């Protein structure tokens, strides 16, 4: 499948402080954030005009699920649009607090762990064909996903009883199973719950919940681009060396704790391989696969960065990728700070920087400041993100949903939508079922809109 439907769901950490002290509980902050949403949507679970879903997840975490996208840059742009949508709610909520005489600064963090050790996720969705063994896909994909943090981790300072250590991934410490149907209780790497949001006879949806939330646009593109490419290779019958892991959960932590990528992890049958070895295998197959697939500039950009990052890890010289990979950008920031102020990694100021890197408020968040200074590379523009806040992707089913929502809101009509249904809540209860996520034009939807 060279054209694939993809989406990213991001849960955001939330807090409210006043002069540095916590002001409101996460529950209370979430209520202020969603008050405007509830006022027009009559719910804290809504679909937006750009086709995305916005809702309050378990544990007061606002969650944004992008609309269905069919290209990497489109997905990165719509993922960034989610940050802007949430930032808009943040500004509105702060104003409400001020109006009520409460005051306080609200922070939304696009990260995966809070100071209390709770974890929240960034889930990737990939449409895959129903034909073929799911077990083969997960067998080949698992070693790739366990070691992928080497190329696209968000980076984190982990405080241990002995000392502070810099890790590749925020999420790795919180994953407890390889493949499972649960998402919150056991936190697997691949979630097998079969909700395709499409024609179930043709497709299934691969739900990957091991990834970090990325601030860097280039890292997000690398994360989803490499996974989509590995899926494409599996579907094409590409043969990979067997890197089945003896214990994926132990391996994911071992990989996260080793920025050199060289520490051996145990494979099934007692063999060993490093994260670098495993990633090199998938990368080498990808380079070969590019010779046989249709040319695609975005995929070629992904494979180029993949190779440069593996070279950087091998040589431990990150100069050629230090504006493109989250964990590298963040580590460089910390190292500069430590050198300038003669500071240990365990210093509270570093922990503060670690958090501020993920602050999504423009002009305040550290990643945003780095990006403005040209210290973080981009694949999209502010103009394209602004458009994605209001407009759905024009090449997928999201366009139908977005146009239906816009028309119903403008006509003052009561409606219900989900990923596959568009329904007018009138006497006739007219409903259109959109089972094909690749289809951006549908006469039935046009007629439904015209009838308003």
UniProtKB/Swiss-Prot annotation:
Changing residue 9 to A: Abolishes pupylation. It holds the Pfam family Pup_ligase. Transmembrane segments: none annotated. GO terms for molecular function: acid-amino acid ligase activity; ATP binding; magnesium ion binding; ubiquitin-like protein transferase activity. ATP binds at residues 53, 66, 419. Catalyzes the covalent attachment of the prokaryotic ubiquitin-like protein modifier Pup to the proteasomal substrate proteins, thereby targeting them for proteasomal degradation. This tagging system is termed pupylation. The ligation reaction involves the side-chain carboxylate of the C-terminal glutamate of Pup and the side-chain amino group of a substrate lysine. PafA is required to confer resistance against the lethal effects of reactive nitrogen intermediates (RNI), antimicrobial molecules produced by activated macrophages and other cell types. This is Pup--protein ligase. The lineage of its organism: Bacteria, Bacillati, Actinomycetota, Actinomycetes, Mycobacteriales.
């Amino acid at each position: 499948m060279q054209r694939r439907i993809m989406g990213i769901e991001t849960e955001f950490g939330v807090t409210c402080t006043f002069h540095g002290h916590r002001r409101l509980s996460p529950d209370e902050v979430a209520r202020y954030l969603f008050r405007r949403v509830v006022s027009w949507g009559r719910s804290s679970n809504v679909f937006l005009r750009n086709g995305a879903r916005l809702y309050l997840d378990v544990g007061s975490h606002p969650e944004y699920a992008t609309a269905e996208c069919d290209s990497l840059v489109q997905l990165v742009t719509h993922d960034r649009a989610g940050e802007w949508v949430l930032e808009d709610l943040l500004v509105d909520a702060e104003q409400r607090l001020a109006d009520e005489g409460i005051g306080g600064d609200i922070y939304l963090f696009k990260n995966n762990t809070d100071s209390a050790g709770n974890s929240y996720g960034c889930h990737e969705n990939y449409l895959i064909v129903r034909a073929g063994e799911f077990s083969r896909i997960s067998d080949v994909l698992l070693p790739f996903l366990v070691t992928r943090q080497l190329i696209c981790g968000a980076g984190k300072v982990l405080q241990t009883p002995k000392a502070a250590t810099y890790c590749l991934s925020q999420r790795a410490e919180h994953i407890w199973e390889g493949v499972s149907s649960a998402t919150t209780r056991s936190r697997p790497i691949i979630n097998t719950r079969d909700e395709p949001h499409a024609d179930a006879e043709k497709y299934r949806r691969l739900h990957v919940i091991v990834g970090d939330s990325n601030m860097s646009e280039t890292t997000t593109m690398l994360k989803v681009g490499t996974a989509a490419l590995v899926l494409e290779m599996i579907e094409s019958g590409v043969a990979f060396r067997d890197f089945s892991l003896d214990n994926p959960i132990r391996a994911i932590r071992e990989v996260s704790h080793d920025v050199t990528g060289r520490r051996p992890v145990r494979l099934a049958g007692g063999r060993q391989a490093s994260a670098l070895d495993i990633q090199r295998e998938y990368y080498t197959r990808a380079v070969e696969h590019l010779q046989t697939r249709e040319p695609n500039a975005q995929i070629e950009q992904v494979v180029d960065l993949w190779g440069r990052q593996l070279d950087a890890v091998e040589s431990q010289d990150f100069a050629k990728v230090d504006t493109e990979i989250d964990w590298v950008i963040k580590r460089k920031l910390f190292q500069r700070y430590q050198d300038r102020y003669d500071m240990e990694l365990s210093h509270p100021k570093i922990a503060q920087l670690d958090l501020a890197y993920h602050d999504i408020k423009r002009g305040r968040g550290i990643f945003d400041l780095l990006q403005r200074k040209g210290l973080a590379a981009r694949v999209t523009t502010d103009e394209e993100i602004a458009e994605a806040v209001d407009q759905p992707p024009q090449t997928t089913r999201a366009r139908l949903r977005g146009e239906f929502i816009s028309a119903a809101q403008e006509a003052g009509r009561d409606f219900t939508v989900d990923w596959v249904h568009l329904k007018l809540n009138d006497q006739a209860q007219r409903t259109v079922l959109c089972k094909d996520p690749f289809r951006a034009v549908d006469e039935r939807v046009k007629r439904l809109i015209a009838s308003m």
